[in-house]
Amino acid sequence: LGDVYKRQALSIVQQLCGHIGRRVEYVIDGEVLTVDCLMCAVCNGRAYGGGFMAGPEAQPDDGWLDVFIVRKVSRRVIAKLLMLYKNGQHFQNGQLTEAAKPYFIYRRAKSVSLRAADDRGPIIATADGECAPCEQVRVEVQPLAGRVLLPQPAYQRFTAKKAAVK
């Protein structure tokens, strides 16, 4: 197992040993949701944390964020959800799978902000493996804000796919 995967697995174990879940207020493209949840993943790519397929259909170049909120569940249910989530089996063909619907909320958005809606202090946000306590987190799409370098074979597949869509 890689180091990133080990750190992600350790983080999950640490979370399971403590208080599970938070009440969080989300504003997703203006829609306000207050949810008792375990976690939220805001994705513009398919995987993170050594292979967790959080956003199995998320694309970095489509101008959208795929937002997955995992509702608060018992420890007993977490193992089942973890395998769905890790393998990307919670989302197929643009929607949550039947197995995931009771436990996940999905939205497609241009902007997402969230903040704790309980009295347990700041939210712990993770980006690229770095964790930090945050009073509020905001993520939004910034078209053409970055450059991505691809190896030649990947670039050829990318341009061929774009040409086929037109």
Please identify what each model-predicted range represents.
Residues Q14-C17, L38-G45:
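Active-site-proximal catalytic alpha-helix in oxidoreductases
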Residues I28-D29, T34, Q59, I69-K166:
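ATP/nucleoside-binding phosphotransfer catalytic cores, i.e., glycine-rich phosphate-binding loops
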